[in-house]
């Protein structure tokens, strides 16, 4: 007779004869075992039976106590798992990598939409103050300007994006304003109240729609025109990811490398360093422009991203220190508001990344704690000097 515990006429509890009814004591024993049993995956190397168990083998029945079934003598082949093996196991949800280099578009070239000089002039004005474009180099800026396409919005209350929809474009507002609505149910609902609560308004120079493109997620809000005669510029999803996100990741890596060289911040953890890198703001200066002025209160710390600059004391005509890519200055502004010890003047086109004291403290707390970690005693950088911090 077939002895499998799950076969016909078999006793799954092993103790009684075939076809017998299991008594209350046996059932009580099984319940006690289940209560005290530690669940172990059958694919783990230490899987086995409790020595006190009434079951003979790892799956009950007539299996031998000292010989494991052949399926357990070697690591299991994933392809041989039963069809129902993963039925109740958790599954993972994946999206596109946020790292643009993971995208494989070897032959990709940015689209180009012809524009008149008047359109280009308007577009440059529209994106001039947008933080997403502030760190782009000249080539990337030209690619963005070429890829953007004009979208006139002639009337009020036109839906540009709807909450819950898939994201396909990123938008820059050139003219007019747009209201933002969020429904707590996560999607646009039917009826006059279906858009949910108004949470904000986007004015000229602002932008929207980037989150759905960055995270491959549904639109998080509904955006409608708040007045007639609005103008948008739209950037397609692929160009957004390839140019804007690629430049963002490259800039973050560069800033993190710069921050590693700042003595004041050398003990930051990688996570703290990435937070600071994301908070840095890009500013540009033309040759001869003053970046910081001697005697002014110090509120920000600067990393020289590109270009060159010189430091001058008083009315001196000779530089007392030269700065190039990767150098930093003004870091003591993170500690106190003492006046600047020198003036820093751009000698070429310069791009700097700045971080204010308030932003630093908001992210990492008082800088004194970082300095105690760093043991910043007797360190002098740039043209600024400081009293050693007593620790």
Swiss-Prot record:
UniProt-annotated binding residues for 3',5'-cyclic AMP 2: 264-381
GO MF annotation terms: cAMP binding; cAMP-dependent protein kinase inhibitor activity; protein kinase A catalytic subunit binding
Record region (Disordered): 1-84
Matches recorded under SMART domains: cNMP
The organism's place on the tree of life at top rank: Eukaryota
Dimerization and phosphorylation as annotated region, ranges: 1-131
Biased composition (Polar residues): 38-55
Residues that bind 3',5'-cyclic AMP 1: 132-261
Keyword set includes Phosphoprotein: yes
Alphabetized SUPFAM superfamilies for the sequence: cAMP-binding domain-like
Sorted UniProt keywords: cAMP, cAMP-binding, Nucleotide-binding, Phosphoprotein, Repeat
Modified residues (Phosphoserine): 92
Pfam families reported for this sequence: cNMP_binding (PF00027)
One GO cellular component, as annotated: nucleus
Family indicated by similarity: Belongs to the cAMP-dependent kinase regulatory chain family.
Subunit and interaction comment: Tetramer, composed of 2 regulatory (R) and 2 catalytic (C) subunits. In the presence of cAMP it dissociates into 2 active monomeric C subunits and an R dimer.
Name the UniProt record assigns to this protein: cAMP-dependent protein kinase regulatory subunit
Gene name tied to this protein: PKAR
């Amino acid at each position: 007779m077939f002895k499998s515990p799950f076969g016909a006429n078999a006793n799954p509890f092993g103790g009684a004869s075939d076809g017998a009814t299991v008594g209350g004591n046996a059932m009580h024993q099984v319940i006690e075992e289940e209560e005290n049993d530690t669940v172990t995956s059958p694919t783990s190397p230490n899987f086995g039976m409790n020595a006190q168990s009434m079951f003979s083998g790892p799956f009950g029945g007539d299996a031998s106590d000292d010989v494991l079934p052949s399926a357990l003598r070697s690591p299991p082949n994933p392809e041989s798992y039963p069809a129902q093996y993963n039925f109740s196991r958790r599954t993972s949800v994946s999206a596109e990598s946020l790292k643009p280099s993971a995208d494989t578009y070897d032959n990709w070239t940015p689209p180009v939409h012809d524009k008149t000089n008047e359109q280009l002039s308007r577009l440059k004005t529209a994106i001039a103050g947008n933080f997403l474009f502030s760190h782009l180099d000249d080539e990337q800026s030209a690619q963005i300007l070429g890829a953007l396409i004009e979208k006139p919005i002639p009337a009020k209350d036109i839906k540009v994006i709807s909450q819950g929809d898939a994201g396909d474009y990123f938008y820059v507002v050139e003219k007019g304003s747009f209201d933002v609505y969020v429904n707590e149910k996560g999607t646009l609902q039917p009826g006059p109240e279906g858009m949910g609560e108004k949470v904000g308004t986007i004015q000229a120079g602002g932008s929207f729609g980037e989150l759905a493109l960055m995270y491959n997620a549904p639109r998080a809000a509904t955006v409608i025109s708040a007045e007639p005669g609005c103008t948008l510029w739209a950037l397609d999803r692929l160009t957004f990811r390839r140019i804007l996100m690629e430049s963002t990741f490259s800039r973050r890596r560069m800033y993190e490398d710069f921050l590693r060289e700042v003595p004041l911040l050398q003990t930051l953890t990688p996570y703290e360093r990435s937070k600071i890198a994301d908070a840095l703001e890009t500013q540009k200066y033309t040759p001869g422009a003053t970046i910081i002025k001697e005697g002014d209160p110090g509120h920000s710390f600067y990393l020289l991203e590109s270009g060159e600059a010189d430091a001058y004391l008083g009315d001196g005509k000779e530089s007392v220190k030269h700065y190039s890519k990767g150098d930093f200055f003004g870091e003591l502004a993170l500690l106190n508001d003492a006046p600047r010890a020198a003036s820093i003047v751009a000698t070429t086109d310069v791009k700097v990344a700045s971080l204010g004291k308030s932003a630093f403290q908001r992210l990492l707390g008082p800088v004194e704690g970082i300095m105690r970690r760093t043991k910043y005693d007797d360190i002098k950088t740039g043209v600024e000097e400081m009293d050693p911090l007593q620790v």
